[in-house]
Amino acid sequence: MFLSLDRTGQQLIRSVLDLYDWDWGSAEAEYKRAIALNPGYATVHHWYAWHLIVMGRNDEGIAELRKAESLDPLSLIISADLADALCIAHLYDESVRQSRKTLEMDPNFAIAHYQLGQAFAQKRTLDEAIGEFKRAIELSGNDDTFEANLAYAYATSGRKDEAIKIVNDLEDRQSQHSSTDASIAVVYLGLGDKDQAMIWLNKAYQARFNPSILVRPAFDSLRSDARFQDLLRRIGLLQIGAPNPLH
């Protein structure tokens, strides 16, 4: 499987396999080996940053993303993911500035509009959040994650009928994509329905989802819930989304 790849690429693929096995210790070891093999490779710092953020080590993750950005300053996805990490760390104003920096490079980069919308949603500037999510949907061709976040913004702004319509549509076309299950949970959190949110998170768990979504501030209202803590325990991430030590 790995014969045609250089050693750094092999380590990255192994780390991704460990992610979907939820083998966090092995994933970290693979990332560190990849960095040792090629410390100037932006992608390995980028991916390692996400591992750190999922582990609740926000300050270290942001530092790795800044390193990745310094190595590849024209990368749209690295720039956008730095904005995402800042939002996860509750550094919303910094996140907004970073998303705007990304959009200066490419005003039509859907992910940057989505990240900007997430920061606005947490700042409770909901009209702006709704506008950014709509733009992300327009540019991406109706991405489920973007639609779920639009529904979340509708729900938290009091436009619950519009949120319910979107979540019903998402449920109707939901298939085997565990990311859609977890995104539907986000909408129910916006609607204040923790029971439905947990039902959909457990569906995502059964489908072996990527749990990085759980670090996002939309899930803050669930962190003290025993059912959510049990989910994290099963994934092996009881400390997921821990507060940034810099705060």
Predicted features, each with a name:
Residues 6-15, 23-247:
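Alpha-helical protein-protein interaction modules
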Residues 20:
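Aromatic-rich carbohydrate-recognition surfaces in CAZymes
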